[in-house]
Design a protein with these regions (language model features):
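Beta-strand/loop-dominated core regions that host nucleotide or nucleotide-derived cofactor-binding catalytic loops
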Residues: 5-33, 37, 43-108, 112-158
Length: 158
């Protein structure tokens, strides 16, 4: 099977039908030396995502911002409250009490993209709760953030 088709089918299955339509056709792939399977994919040396062993895709911030151009992808996103924005963008986990809006396509263990109200990607990570479990939990983690737009090393020290 063509690697472009395989990634398109995979993204549509995980994030919703038609989401892969915003992907460019000139994707580059890196393959495993042992198995020959696709490990990751990107555009011009910029990583979009990595295929996980459980069948999911670990998106980068760059990859999430590309997929966010498709309106149906927003159901895989979470919007935090204003007070949590600086912490999440540093790469810290998002707690349930700081969630303002939760997409309907997010399940336990699925890829979650944290965005602000103007649809700018702040962080990407893995969801710990589903939408139905979110309401009763106050001190629990909603998303374990893997990558934020600001790394802690870039911040200035006083």
């Amino acid at each position: 099977m063509n690697p472009n088709e395989k990634i398109s089918y995979h993204i549509d299955a995980l994030f919703g039908k038609g989401v892969s339509s915003v992907l460019p056709r000139q994707l580059t792939f890196s393959y495993s030396r042992k198995t020959g399977r696709i490990k990751s994919f990107g555009i011009n040396d910029q990583l979009i995502g990595t295929l996980r062993s459980d069948g999911g895709i670990a998106l980068t911030i760059f990859g999430a911002s590309i997929l966010l151009n498709e309106s149906s992808f927003k159901q895989n996103c979470i919007i935090p409250k204003e007070e949590a924005l600086p912490f999440v963008s540093e790469g810290r986990s998002l707690f349930c009490k700081h969630v303002e809006w939760f997409g309907s396509n997010i399940n336990i263990g699925s890829e979650a993209v944290v965005i602000d109200k103007s649809d700018v990607v702040l962080a990407v990570g893995k969801s710990v709760v589903s939408q139905s479990q979110l309401l009763g939990r106050i001190g629990d983690v909603a998303v374990r953030v893997r990558e934020g737009i600001k790394s802690r090393g870039e911040q200035q020290k006083p």
